[in-house]
Amino acid sequence: MDIKAIFNRLLNHEELKREETKELLIAITRGELNDAEIAALLTAIQMRGISVEELLGFRDGILATGVPVPLDCDRYIDVVGTGGDRKNTFNISTTACFVIAGAGYKVAKHGNYAATSVSGASNVIKNHGVNFTADLDKLNRSINECGIVYLHAQLFAKAMKFVGAIRKALPFPTFFNLLGPIINPSKPQCQLLGVANLDQMRLYQQVYQKIGIDYGIVNSIDGYDEISLTGPFKVTKIGRAHV
């Protein structure tokens, strides 16, 4: 891959093809990009804004190089937020997952350590004494006996270990915040997503339609990636997803 040519195109505000961003992600997992190049890539795309095809390509790359999780469960949901809203709230999506599981619905929660916030889903789960695992038998037992399973992203998405420190060092959220919600290795049939702004809502509508799952997307107009009581909020959904 000609990384210099890729950067020149990004500097000219050109969009990359889905297959190109997939190859970029795979190159990152192979260690073919150094930290400076990865930081430059994250910054360039953040400044221009990511397209639907680019986001799907990065998703393809993460799933292609990651560890799949074929859960032995008919139907389950993931509840997640993009993060990066700078509101410093507690982990609302993670909390909601336990409420949903308590109500009798199966949940496959996918998350990671904090990148742009104080506490990520994995920080919360770990601090409550849960040991992360990639053992499929244990994961299946968790979702079928407890109604919820937690999938720590770094055990399944190899790319995360290459970008984690860089994301933490950058003073702004990157497209990896947008990738997080759509790279659950168990590929849930339904997802409830909180986004920080209406541009993200429109982006994910197109992404989910191409992925082909039932979904609900929520956004508070004052910038929370949750349904908030601090002001009006918007909800969009498709399929059998109910909000």
Task: Kindly label every feature range from the protein language model.
Residues M1-D2, E15-E23, E32-A40, I50-G57, ...:
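Conserved active-site and cofactor/substrate-binding residues in soluble primary-metabolism enzymes
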Residues M1-N88, A103:
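Acidic, glycine/proline-rich low-complexity segments that act as flexible tails and inter-domain linkers
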Residues I45, I100, Y208:
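Hydrophobic pocket-lining residues that define ligand/cofactor binding sites across diverse proteins
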Residues P70-V80, A108-A114, F176-L179:
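Core alpha/beta catalytic barrel or barrel-like domain that forms the active/cofactor pocket
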Residues G81, D85-S142:
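A generic, well-ordered mixed alpha/beta core segment in the N-terminal half of proteins
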